[in-house]
Each structure stands twice: as structure tokens, then as C-alpha cells.
Amino acid sequence: MYNNARALKPVSERDALKKALYKIKARHNGELKSLKTAWVNFNDAFCDGLEWRTITVVGARPGTGKTLFMEQLVNDVIKMNPDQKFRVLKFQFEMLDETNGIRKLSMNVGSDYNTLMSKGKPIDKGIFQRCVQFYEDTASYDMVDVVYDPCTVEEMCATIHAYMLENKTDEGFTNTLVTIDHSALFKTGGKYKDKFDMLYGLGEALTEMKKKFPVAFLVLSQLNRNVETPERAKDGTYGNYILDSDLYGSDALLQHADVVLGINRPYNRKIKFYGPERYIINNPDLLVFHILKSRNGFMGMTFFKLDRVIMRIVEVDPPPTAS
């Protein structure tokens, strides 16, 4: 009967209320805080920043700056939350460790990749010394660890479990921000026949991990190619916007995520008037963040741009609209 399924033991809902009261009190007393970023509107999509035990999925097409977004976010939360004790565990499947290091140096010294790689002319000695100084400064806050080896979803879970135990203190598990770049690069096989099976398994695994440990997940994902069709690029139409259905394997991750963002770069798609509001697009570095899902915060869209002088993504006011 019931295929020998095990019976689950219900618990009183008062247990949940008790935990809620503890959390409310901890937030009030400042014992529990969100991770604030430099982006006010991004923080508003949450409860004053990234909350622990949440899953955030960020989808974008190649060339829109999603990896820079993630690297800047990690960089900023370390600088802007010095009163919080936490670690960062990055699953970086897409680039070599040295390339990851160059990108981090680029963002922190304000020089682009080609400058650091001496394209056209040798790198300025002052810039190189700033790179060296940044590396030496990281010794005082060595709190970021990276996994570069491709792995399965199960291996990711085992790695997180071991990492949490390794960094456990007498006070308990250490809060950990876990970043994944990107979701489709996990290896398939075993019980996962294809990428879509794997993404469903990933969503379930992330939910299991956030229930078990004080982690916050930031997951980068691709968007489907259909966002680049000529029909979607027609000026002044709703199809210009990123939709939750554009997320690769959308159903698999959407139902598990607490916050879902879609990043768009309208200029790349030759859109001159963005969406029904007809925002005027004349800046190739303008980014539009569509907040597609938010359990506890702001939904809608907000505007950013890549500031190439300082190699950072910065918030900007909405562009003017055409009549």
C-alpha cells in the first residue's frame, strides 16, 4: 500500500510562530541583518539587501554584464557589511582561475581587462602597483573560496555541507553567500538525464540546502534565445521586456527562487524606444534590471549603467521617454 512510502510526522504550527518571533526579535536587535549592496533599488527587491536562507536567480544573455554584476555584488557586500561575520563560496565553472582574478583586479583598480593585459601598450606601473596592493590587502579578509572544477548537483551539495562543517564555530554554522556561475554548467548524468532534469534537481537541492544551513544563494542563469528575435526587438512593445518565461528552464528554478531578476541591454538588440513607456535608448552601456519575482520586496524594473571609467555597474535614473 502506498508503495511502501514513509509516513511524515506533522509538527505544530506554533513551532513556526516561535521561530518567526525569534527572527523578528533578532532583526529588531540587529543580531540578524541582510547583506546590503551599493544598489538601493536592488536592496529594495529584498528586505534591505540579500537575506539569509534565500535563493536569488539572475538571468541574462551573454554580453550583458551578469558576471560583472555578481563579482561587484560579492565585492560590495564584503566592504559594506564589516559588522557581519560571513564567508563566500563561489562555484565558478565558466572561466579559468587567473581570468577570474584579472576580472576582480579590473573592478577594484578601475582598469579594464585590455589595459591590465597590456593591449596596445604595456600596463602603467602605477596600475600594476595598485593590483599588487589589492592582492596584499586581501590577506586581512581572506573570506572567499572558489570551486573551479565542474561538478554535479550532488557534488555541489556535498561541497557545501563539508564547507559549512569546516567553518563551523562554537556559535554554530557561519553564514555563507554561495554564488553559482552559471546554472546550466552543472554536469548531467546519474538520475538527471538532461539539462532540464538537472535544473529541476538543482532547484530542489538549493531549497534543501537553505533549509539546512544559513546560506544565501546567488545563481546566474542564461536566458532563452527567443529574447533576441526581431519581433521582440520591435520598438515600444512589451516584448522588449525580459519575462520570467525567458529564463532558461524557467519552471525549474522559478518556483524555488525567492527573487528572480532579468538583466537586459536594449542597445545590443538595436532597440531605440524600450517597452510601452518608450524609454529612449541611446547609451550602449545602459542596463535594465527587471525584478520578475520578489517574495518580500519591490517588483518592477530599475536602470543601471556600466561606468567604464571606474569599471562598475551603477544605478541611474530612468531615461526620458518619447512622446
Language-model-detected regions and their locations in the chain:
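A short beta-strand-to-loop transition that corresponds to the Sensor-1 phosphate-sensing loop
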Residues: 92-95, 182, 215, 219-225, ...
